[in-house]
């Protein structure tokens, strides 16, 4: 666990981006600071992945209130299984001080199972695939109590994931941002490792 904390400290040192998370419904277990932390955590991991795996068009993620609503509908079912391909689920049996960090580290730990850049739904990499799918540029998360356990769900968009599909394209980081269209450029807030814009 301590190695994950060191990695997190290193990747969150990349950048701090301002965001307006106040447009989402206010929740008992999820505030704007947590929304921001989920977003920055994902972008930090994506930047580290882009650097180490040489991804050519990894997008910066932004927080999305519509995806948060979908995540809450799923989380309130208290299932420990994802309801869709574009969903990560984590369940804690004990109280944790930092829910985004705990869930993010759990999902990120699948990096050690990742073999190549093609997604295999029978592998143990569904969560990491969602975190680093290069065309995902939105996320929304939910935190709910279910019979004394904390359920964390994050939904990702746009839909892209599928068995046999490519998780990321190789190449120099940011070298293919323009594949997403005019106006998509390299994000210097993330050391020119992630693409930003729509």
Swiss-Prot record:
Tissues expressing the protein: Detected in cephalic glands.
**UniProt-listed CDD domains:** CAP_euk
Hydrolase keyword on record: no
The protein's superkingdom reads Eukaryota
Per the record, GO CC terms?
extracellular region
Q: Where in the cell is it found?
A: Secreted
Which cystines does this chain contain?
24-65, 78-146, 141-154, 174-186, 177-195
Query: Which keywords does this Swiss-Prot/TrEMBL entry list?
Result: Disulfide bond, Hemostasis impairing toxin, Platelet aggregation inhibiting toxin, Secreted, Signal, Toxin
Report a single Gene Ontology molecular function: toxin activity
SUPFAM superfamilies recorded for this chain?
A: PR-1-like
Q: Which InterPro entries did the record assign?
A: CAP_dom, CAP_sf, CRISP-related
Q: What else is known?
A: The RGD motif is not positioned at the apex of a tight turn, making it unlikely to interact with the integrin.
The entry describes its oligomerization and partners as: Monomer.
In its UniProt entry, what is this protein called?
Hookworm platelet inhibitor 1
In which organism is this protein found?
A: Ancylostoma caninum (Dog hookworm)
Identify the taxonomic lineage of the organism of origin.
Answer: Eukaryota, Metazoa, Ecdysozoa, Nematoda, Chromadorea
């Amino acid at each position: 666990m301590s190695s994950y904390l060191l990695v997190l400290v290193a990747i969150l040192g990349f950048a701090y981006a301002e965001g307006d998370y106040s447009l989402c419904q206010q929740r008992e277990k999820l505030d704007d600071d947590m929304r921001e932390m989920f977003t920055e955590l994902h972008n930090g991991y994506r930047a580290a992945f882009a650097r180490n795996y040489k991804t050519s068009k990894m997008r910066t993620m932004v927080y999305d209130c519509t995806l948060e609503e979908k995540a809450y509908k799923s989380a309130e079912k208290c299932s420990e299984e994802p309801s869709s391909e574009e969903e990560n689920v984590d369940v804690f049996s004990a109280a944790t001080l930092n829910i985004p960090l705990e869930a993010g580290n759990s999902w990120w730990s699948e990096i050690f199972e990742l073999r190549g850049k093609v997604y295999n739904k029978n592998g143990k990499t569904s969560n990491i695939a969602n975190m680093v799918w290069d065309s995902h540029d939105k996320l929304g998360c939910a935190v709910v109590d279910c019979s004394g356990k904390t359920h964390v769900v994050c939904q990702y968009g746009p839909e892209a994931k599928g068995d046999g599909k490519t998780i990321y394209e190789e190449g120099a980081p940011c070298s293919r941002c323009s594949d997403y269209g005019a106006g998509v450029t390299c994000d210097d807030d993330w050391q020119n490792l992630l693409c930003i814009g729509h």
